[in-house]
Amino acid sequence: VTAFGSNGIGKTTFAKILAGVEKPTDGEIIEKVDIAYKPQYIESDYEGTAQDYLFENAPSYGSNIFNSEVGRPLALDNLLDKKVKKLSGGELQRLALAVTLSQDADIYLFDEPTAFLDVEQRLIAARVIRKIIESRNAASLIVDHDIVFIDYISDRAMVFSGEPGLNGKASKPADLRTSMNQFLGDLDITFRRDKETKRPRVNKYDSYLDREQKEQGEYY
């Protein structure tokens, strides 16, 4: 399940509450499942190397399964000898993804897993996350803004709406097409499928395709 919407609308707060990082102002979360959580902002003040960090924080690091399903796809070998403090934003993101995916959990929460990653790295991350979630028969909630990433990884989606910084509410999970039509309709933006790659691409505003899709109520 992916969650998307405007900035400052409550998506990160929602993820933090589910992860137990923050307490809800009303009600309570009944913890009956194991949750692995990758926060939006990644701390980089660790003194050691990336390999030291993995040894300390990634339970399955070093196993054949970890190396084949996580390490190689995320190109972790290129990071191992580097100091965590010296890692770039994209390198920190890959390290954080690896640590989260190394855990045995019922639910995996990812807050903006594509931040600082280039286009190809984002698609690789999507493949890695989806493969592992499916192979473990687990569930995931992913907060992100990248339409291509969301399109690849989502089975269902939640749309957050409201007034940024003041209040927000989430729709119940629905199929991706329904959720995207709701979200993009509010933004007055349409997407089409690229004929070759099948990836979503934004239509030029007020173009023929843009107008045609809006007349049909098909924003996505």
Predicted regions and their residues:
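ABC ATPase nucleotide-binding domains
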Residues: K169-Y220
